[in-house]
């Protein structure tokens, strides 16, 4: 379906015959989150190439029945100017109107790039937006923004709308929609944005729900830039007790400072994974700590051995008070690493407690060869984290993985594969002593070579009464866009197109992590196009339609 709309868009904008692009008002509606705390959120982008038209007078916006109008503070119309005469791109904007990357400029439209034409407060079902904009000869860009009531909007609110008509030079015209109809805009919260708490970037989300229903979100706090280790990076944690609507002040459960007398940028900790021991209620964070390698890229700089002066350390810390406070991190590298390996660390995201009480994290290691060949597997503890074990890897050329327990107790490892194209999947019945390639491996779940999330939801823990696998990633083989949640009702044998929901089609960093907020609602923490770390809540019924 996506290819059809792209073809239509190109045909309408590029074809010199038939329906003329000139003087036609084209409308594009993108599937992106609406952040509750933002002053501006892009709802529609509009493009008008003026050859004869002189003025855009007004636009008429109609909201759908599902829209929570009482929670919308305002709707705005902006003029985005024109485009270079030499541009060959079929763009709908000359630049991003709101930045997700520029610290301090992540909440509102940058006035350097947009002219506010009209603002309607407390909108009704139909809104008339006055433009009265003299058209520049050639391309003209406009966009419509929506602002929610920050304290009243709910995570499960939605916005649906259409640009039903326009007036150009006093004449009524019908806009041409070049994107799919029926886009449902879902609410989100920017848990971490560029510049928050003095950090340039936040990456690598992990998410769990504690036994008390608290959400614990972990991530990299990348102070200087978005670069991977080695850099000045700590593990940050945000805590929510209201299902993700609000988040407490950031904590830093893992931070090594100037350990060993080295600068903070040579003591980075990153790529966190988090799990909750369902039997004890304790929460565990696993992370990699890099030390003694200057500021070179850790993937290529860590070497065989066991000492932190030579090789990266897999460290863990735990909380026994629902994530409020955390123990000092300790290294489990001596228990787990083969001294001949170069890099050994966890799979970022989350771990699990199996039905027999075993704690399991995904892991990965690299050989000390020219290509640093990676392998994914798992580590586990059968004494509530006192000691950890591992066996053999599932497959080579695989890295960031996530583990889930199937309905029969088998463990499934879903792996990022450096060969690209699709996820690798393997299963084990003995905690990784032996592995079996899954029938869907390298075929069922496409990927652009990126981290992904996989969780299992037992039948007695969801309102549908079915054992469900949920998977999220950029549903593409190019770029990191189209963040999608998919569901499988047969232990991952099939992933039906009807059982999925698209959350964000724009480009981002693409990592994600899933959890169940309650028996009806899925929570996702991900690197979106609108904030470094975004949280959304999605009802299961909006994902699964085949039942």
Question: What residue spans do the PLM features occupy?
Answer:
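Asp-box/BNR beta-propeller blade signature and adjacent active/binding-site loops
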Residues: 40, 52-54, 82-84, 104-105, ...
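Disordered, low-complexity tails and leader-like regions
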Residues: 16, 21, 94-99, 379
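Tandem-repeat/low-complexity and Cys-motif detector
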Residues: 33-36, 66-67
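Short beta-strand elements of extracellular/lumenal beta-sandwich folds
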Residues: 38-64
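Boundary/junction segments of secreted and surface-exposed precursor proteins
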Residues: 21-33
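Extended intrinsically disordered, low-complexity coil regions enriched in Ser, Thr, Gly, Ala
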Residues: 54-56, 61-98, 102, 152-177
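A generic structural signal for ordered secondary structure
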Residues: 6, 14, 43-47, 316, ...
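Bacterial Sec-dependent N-terminal signal peptides
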Residues: 1-22
């Amino acid at each position: 379906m996506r290819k059809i709309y792209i073809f239509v868009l190109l045909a309408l904008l590029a074809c010199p015959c038939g329906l003329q692009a000139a003087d036609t008002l084209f409308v594009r509606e993108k599937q992106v989150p609406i952040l509750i705390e933002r002053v501006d959120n892009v709802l529609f982008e509009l493009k008008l190439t003026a050859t004869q038209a002189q003025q855009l007078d007004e636009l008429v916006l109609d909201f759908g029945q599902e829209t929570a109008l009482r929670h919308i503070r305002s709707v705005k119309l902006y003029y985005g100017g024109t485009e270079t005469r030499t541009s060959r791109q079929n763009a709908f904007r000359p630049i991003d109107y709101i930045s997700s990357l520029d610290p301090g400029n992540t909440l509102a439209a940058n006035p350097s790039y947009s002219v506010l034409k009209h603002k309607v407060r407390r909108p009704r079902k139909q809104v008339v937006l006055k433009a009265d904009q003299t058209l520049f000869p050639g391309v003209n860009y406009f966009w419509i923004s929506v602002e929610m009531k920050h304290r009243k909007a709910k995570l499960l609110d939605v916005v649906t709308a259409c640009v039903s008509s326009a007036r150009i030079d006093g004449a009524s015209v019908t806009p041409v929609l070049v994107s799919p109809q029926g886009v449902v805009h879902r609410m989100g919260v920017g848990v971490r944005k560029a510049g928050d708490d003095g950090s340039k970037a936040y990456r690598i989300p992990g998410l769990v729900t504690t036994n008390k229903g608290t959400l614990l979100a972990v991530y990299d706090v990348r102070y200087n830039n978005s670069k991977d280790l080695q850099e000045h990076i700590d593990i940050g944690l945000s805590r929510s007790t209201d299902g993700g609507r609000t988040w407490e002040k950031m904590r830093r459960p893992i931070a090594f400072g100037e350990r060993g007398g080295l600068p903070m940028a040579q003591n980075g900790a990153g790529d966190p994974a988090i799990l909750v021991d369902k039997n004890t209620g304790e929460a565990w964070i696993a992370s990699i700590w890099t030390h003694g390698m200057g500021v070179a890229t850790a993937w290529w700089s860590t070497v065989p051995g066991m000492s932190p002066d030579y090789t990266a350390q897999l460290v863990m810390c735990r909380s026994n008070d629902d994530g409020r406070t955390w123990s000092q991190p300790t290294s489990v590298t001596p228990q787990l690493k083969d001294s001949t390996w170069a890099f050994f660390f966890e799979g970022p995201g989350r771990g699990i407690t199996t039905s027999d009480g075993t704690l399991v994290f995904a892991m990965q290691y690299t050989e000390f060869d020219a290509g640093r060949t990676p392998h994914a597997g798992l580590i586990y503890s059968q004494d509530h984290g006192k000691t950890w074990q591992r066996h053999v890897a599932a497959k080579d050329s695989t890295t960031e993985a996530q583990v889930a327990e199937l309905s029969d107790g088998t463990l499934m490892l879903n792996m990022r594969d450096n060969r690209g194209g699709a996820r690798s999947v393997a299963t084990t019945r003995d905690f990784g002593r032996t592995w079996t390639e899954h029938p869907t491996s390298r075929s069922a779940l496409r990927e652009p070579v990126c981290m992904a999330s996989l969780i299992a939801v037992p039948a007695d823990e969801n309102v549908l009464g079915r054992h469900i696998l949920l998977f999220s990633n950029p549903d593409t083989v190019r770029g990191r866009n189209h963040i999608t949640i998919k569901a499988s009702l047969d232990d991952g044998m099939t992933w039906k197109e009807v059982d999925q929901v698209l959350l964000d089609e724009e480009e981002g960093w693409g990592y994600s992590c899933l959890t169940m907020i309650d028996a009806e609602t899925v929570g996702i923490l991900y690197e979106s196009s609108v904030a470094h770390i975004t949280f959304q809540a999605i009802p299961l019924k909006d994902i699964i339609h085949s039942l």
